[in-house]
């Protein structure tokens, strides 16, 4: 039995916890509180290539799934900027700002009494946009004050204090004006503009000018010349946003910011936008159309946005995509430029560097002292288990510390398999079980369960292929791996949600045997462990390099069968309701989804679960909850102990303020208990009523496969 002293074991736990950190949780020394970001940052690419790209004076989208290190890169960037003389930064957690924005009901009531006011629903949305922008400006102001007071600027602080004070007074003035009735009058006049714009553009110009004269700033101008034209509905919404934005006089604000910061020698303001993809789709568009795109275009190269986003959850709006950098952090985008073996080697090396950096700092030993067996194979299996995702890797190390190290057992291949299995069951598998309780329409919940049907078909096929025979398979010693499959790249969007939730990962792009470009996906390592699917690819033979694109791994027919069964393509015109086959979808898309039957309706594509329709219909509507509240219950259920809001926030990748607010709502519903501990900190604890309602074992919680699971007698890797 291996033994390690208590200090070394504690250091391993700290190393694991440092990788588990979410969002803006500081990477710091536990006792001294000193920042460790410079010492422990490990760039995914050699020579700090990712950091250097993000540090360019250009707008950048940093794109990756949860846990890929977007916020860590932002922290490292800010640390770097604090040592420069010509740039500064402002971090804005968009999701938290959005959640905290409120519509003033008294102001809404006053607006609805005006004859020229917009409809109440539209007013509520616009006022929400206004509050959202106000909060963003306040965040930037707060960060700039910290920068002015920083030690780097001590020598110049006295010379600029007066200017900075004036700047902040100006910001406060702008915020105050947003709540005055002249702001409301501008909205009222704009209503007439929208109604007449389609009929005669010259009349529209006159009315826009009228709106400008009401503003408190005589120099403020509102012009229709910059309006984009996509559709009448979209044009209307964007014009509202422009009136709102220009009522804040953002262009003037940026000019004043620039003037003050130029006195400090600052040439660029980097605004770091985190959790962008956590916003609802409508809010995401508003943020870009009303805030990011105008600031990016108006600021004369002064403001540079760094935007953290999820793959497939992006919206560029008027931002010129050819003029921004896009940095991807998931494994294929990072390392997939060569052949698959080189990609794996690069990802394994990043995993090794990441773990070694943390273990050497917190334990002062090499990671191999915790391993048993072939060290090279252990690193390979750790990569397979986490797909080079730092946060997932942290959870795996935490589980390994808990299940093996503190019990005197070293980490081997079986231990990694068990940790991955546990991670899948605790962190990933619950997506479908909780999905049926999501406070959304039946169609939305059915769409989630349709993906469960797709995943079941994929996993079932992978299990069936274990008994497949071919010339290539006969050359493989032992059980051949079936964890990967390929589909034409045009089918990728069907798997995007499953990938975003870590059921699978895009592994590579290759040309299949017929020369067609295909996307290769890898099933989650823990999922493969649970369902006895051997993971990886064989090595040793030249022809094994094309193993992933063998014809029996082509799942195109499976996808087409799923679409035929679950996808509805229907015209939304109540008088038409024409239904179309999947084969006609490409042609319909070329005409902007215009219905070819009635020539007026829009064709809608919906994925519905027929297999689980009865189960979804049977859910008591009183049990439906927002996603964040379901996440709180899931976390409390898994941890099996009372937790502080900050700890829950760490698991759910959100702010502790949001957890506190939603925790109170759950307590009001009798689902959790909110009681202070001895130190006066309020703790949340799941109640038996919630356990019974949401977590009672049901036959369909796990994947419903036709055949029973086989005995897991082998590790899941080749």
Predicted segments with their positions:
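The catalytic "switch" region of P-loop NTPases
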Residues: 237-375, 379, 416, 420, ...
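Conserved nucleotide-binding/hydrolysis micro-motifs of P-loop NTPases
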Residues: 96-99, 311-315, 390, 400
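C-terminal leucine-rich, beta-strand-based interaction scaffolds used for sensing/assembly
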Residues: 95, 392, 402, 411-656, ...
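Extended, charged/polar low-complexity intrinsically disordered regions
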Residues: 1-21, 26-29, 149-154, 491-496, ...
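Walker A/P-loop-proximal flanking segment of P-loop NTPase domains
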Residues: 1-114, 716
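Short acidic, S/G/P-rich loop/turn micro-motifs used as interaction or catalytic elements
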Residues: 68-69, 98, 276-282, 314, ...
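P-loop NTPase catalytic cores that bind/hydrolyze ATP
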Residues: 123-166, 170, 376-417, 485-527
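P-loop NTPase nucleotide-binding core
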Residues: 71-266, 311, 322, 601-602, ...
């Amino acid at each position: 039995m291996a033994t390690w002293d208590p200090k070394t074991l504690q250091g391993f736990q700290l190393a694991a916890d440092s990788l588990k950190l979410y969002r803006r949780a500081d990477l710091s020394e536990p006792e001294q509180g000193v920042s460790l970001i410079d010492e422990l940052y490990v760039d995914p690419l050699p020579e700090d290539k990712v950091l250097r790209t993000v540090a360019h004076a250009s707008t950048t989208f940093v794109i990756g799934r949860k846990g890929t290190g977007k916020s860590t890169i932002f922290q490292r960037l800010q640390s770097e900027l604090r040592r420069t003389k010509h740039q500064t930064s402002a971090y804005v957690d968009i999701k938290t700002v959005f959640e905290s924005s409120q519509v003033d009901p008294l102001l809404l009531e006053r607006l609805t009494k005006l004859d020229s006011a917009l409809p109440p629903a539209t007013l509520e949305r616009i006022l929400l946009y206004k509050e959202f922008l106000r909060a963003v400006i306040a965040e930037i102001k707060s960060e700039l004050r910290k920068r002015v007071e920083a030690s780097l600027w001590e020598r110049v602080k006295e010379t600029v204090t007066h200017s900075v004070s004036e700047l902040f007074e100006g910001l406060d003035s702008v915020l105050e004006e947003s709540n005055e009735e002249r702001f409301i009058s501008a909205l009222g006049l704009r209503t007439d503009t929208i109604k007449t714009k389609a009929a005669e553009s010259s009349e529209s110009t006159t009315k826009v000018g009228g709106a400008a004269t009401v503003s408190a700033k005589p120099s403020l101008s509102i012009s229709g010349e910059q309006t984009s034209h996509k559709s009448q509905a979209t044009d209307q919404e964007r014009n509202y946003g422009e009136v709102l934005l220009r009522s804040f006089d953002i262009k003037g604000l940026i000019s004043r910011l620039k003037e003050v910061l130029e006195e400090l020698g600052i040439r660029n303001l980097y605004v770091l936008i985190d959790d962008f993809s956590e916003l609802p789709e409508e809010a995401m568009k508003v943020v870009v159309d009303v805030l990011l795109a105008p600031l990016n275009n108006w600021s004369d190269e002064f403001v540079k946005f760094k935007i953290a986003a999820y793959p497939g959850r992006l919206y560029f709006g008027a931002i010129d995509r050819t003029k921004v950098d896009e940095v991807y952090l998931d494994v294929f985008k990072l390392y997939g430029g060569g052949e698959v073996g080189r990609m794996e080697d690069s990802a394994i090396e990043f995993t090794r560097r990441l773990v070694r950096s943390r273990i050497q700092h917190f334990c002062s030993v090499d990671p191999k002292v915790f391993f048993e067996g072939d060290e090279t194979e252990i690193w390979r299996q750790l990569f397979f288990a986490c797909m080079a995702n730092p946060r997932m890797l942290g959870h795996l190390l935490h589980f390994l510390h808990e299940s093996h190290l503190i019990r005197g057992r070293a980490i081997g291949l079986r231990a990694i398999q068990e940790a991955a299995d546990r991670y899948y069951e605790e962190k990933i598998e619950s997506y479908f079980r909780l999905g049926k309780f999501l406070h959304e329409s039946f169609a939305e919940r059915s769409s989630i369960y349709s993906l469960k049907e797709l995943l079941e078909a994929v996993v079932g096929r992978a299990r069936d292929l274990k008994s497949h025979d071919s010339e290539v398979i006969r050359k493989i010693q032992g059980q051949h791996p079936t964890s990967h499959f390929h589909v034409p790249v045009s089918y990728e969007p069907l798997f995007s949600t499953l990938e975003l939730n870590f059921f699978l990962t895009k592994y590579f792009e290759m040309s299949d045997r017929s020369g067609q470009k295909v996307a290769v996906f890898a099933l989650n390592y823990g999922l493969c462990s649970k369902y006895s699917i051997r993971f990886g690819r064989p090595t040793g033979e030249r022809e094994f390099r094309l193993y992933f694109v063998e014809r029996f791994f082509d799942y195109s027919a499976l996808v087409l069968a799923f679409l035929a069964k679950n996808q509805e393509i229907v015209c939304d015109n109540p008088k038409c309701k024409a239904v179309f086959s999947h084969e006609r979808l490409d042609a319909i898309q070329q005409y902007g989804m215009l219905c070819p039957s009635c020539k007026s309706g829009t064709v809608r594509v919906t994925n519905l679960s027929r297999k689980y329709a009865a189960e979804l219909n049977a859910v008591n509507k009183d049990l439906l909850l927002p996603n964040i509240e379901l996440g709180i219950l899931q976390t409390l259920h898994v941890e099996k102990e009372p937790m502080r809001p900050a700890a829950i926030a760490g698991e759910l990748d959100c702010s502790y303020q949001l957890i506190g607010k939603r925790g109170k709502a759950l307590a009001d519903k009798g689902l959790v208990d909110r009681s202070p501990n001895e130190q006066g900190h309020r703790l949340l604890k799941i109640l038996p009523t919630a356990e019974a309602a949401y977590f009672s074992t049901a036959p369909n919680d796990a994947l419903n496969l036709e055949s029973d699971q086989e005995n897991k007698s082998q590790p899941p890797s080749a």
